[in-house]
């Protein structure tokens, strides 16, 4: 679904708590956040980590497991960077399974979720977290950051 500017503004007015940047400490790490912070309190959290080298049938199996567990009440946690992770995020949002997304390049002061996440944020099924300051230029240590975010996702899931 495409949301035009007027609809975006209306959704932000209806749910200001989900569209306000805040500073928080999550698993002992200072982070910026936008979205539904209460998702951190859901007891069952599932980390998703898909190598770029997985075959589509392997991604599909992980996706099915995530969707089943999500429908049973789990929150899915991941940076959602790899194509497989992105497929899982998209499938989860289509059936209103909550996501905690760890962003690799921080959040600018005027941050607004991209189209694919906007409606999920308005519906309270999305939390975006980042331990990094905003960076618009190319990230030099991408692999290290990805590993850090996967480690943070694991820590969030262990609670």
Feature annotation, model-predicted:
Residues 1-159:
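Glycine-biased, small-residue-rich flexible motifs in mid-sequence functional cores and linkers
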């Amino acid at each position: 679904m495409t949301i035009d500017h007027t609809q975006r503004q209306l959704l932000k007015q209806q749910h200001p708590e989900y569209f306000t940047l805040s500073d928080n400490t999550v698993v002992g790490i200072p982070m910026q956040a936008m979205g539904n912070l209460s998702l951190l309190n859901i007891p069952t959290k599932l980390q998703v980590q898909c190598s770029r080298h997985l075959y589509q049938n392997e991604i599909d199996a992980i996706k099915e497991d995530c969707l089943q567990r999500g429908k049973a009440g789990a929150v899915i946690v991941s940076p959602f960077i790899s194509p497989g992770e992105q497929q899982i995020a998209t499938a989860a949002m289509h059936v209103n399974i909550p996501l905690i997304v760890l962003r690799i390049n921080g959040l600018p002061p005027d941050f607004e979720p991209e189209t694919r996440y906007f409606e999920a944020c308005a519906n309270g099924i999305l939390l975006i977290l980042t331990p990094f300051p905003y960076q618009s230029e190319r990230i030099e240590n991408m692999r290290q950051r990805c590993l850090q975010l996967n480690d943070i996702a694991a820590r969030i899931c262990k609670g």
